[in-house]
Amino acid sequence: MAEVTEKVILPKFDKEKYFKDGEIVYGKREEVEEAADKVCADGFKNIVLLGIGGTEFELAPIEYQVKKYSDIDISAYNAADANTVHPKNITKDTVVVTASASGDTVEVVEATEWIVETGAQVIAFTKKEGKLGKFLTEKGKIVIEADVTTGGCEFSYVLFNFLAFKIMNNKGAFPKYKEFADGMKGVFQNLYDIRVQFDARAEEAAKKYYNAPYSIFCGSGAAWGETSLCVS
């Protein structure tokens, strides 16, 4: 077995950029909550989560948590699959939640084009000047943009949680939402601290298993989406 000589260390992580992006994301809280309030005031019968690739898996915890802690009708679709079958539960009484980091994810753009024709409300986390953002804005749908580039999935998780949990709160299913959302203000410092604390263990595991014939990722519940993403 070849000796491991390269060491990827935490100082390569751009801490200041990470914290700055975290502030931007948290600063979107009010805008996201307003979107939640609007769809609740307008009324809806079900929520559909729509994504492909990483977005599909990032939305998975929301489906799990909403199903576990509320009686809201929620389902999730791979955008390519949805474009094939046009699910009948997407109607004028549906709230569709989607996202596109690039702003022009082909399958998501295609899906929203026929979804808006059903009269469904759409909330998209994407670039306002991207193809998806421009289209949905023209159609009077909700577009929320957070211009961040570091941190992986966790920025998306915070935004998705604000939306889903505020909707649950409005429906009487999450009475401590404000306490939760206030507490999220320090989450990025906590996540950075976890990185620091885990760095040595991660290096040890990498040295021990980097050349293993195969790896098994274990997860369930709210963690299953991210576990699947690791494998995919």
Where in the sequence are the language-model features?
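Active-site phosphate/pyrophosphate-binding segments
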Residues: 8-45, 143-152, 159, 164-232
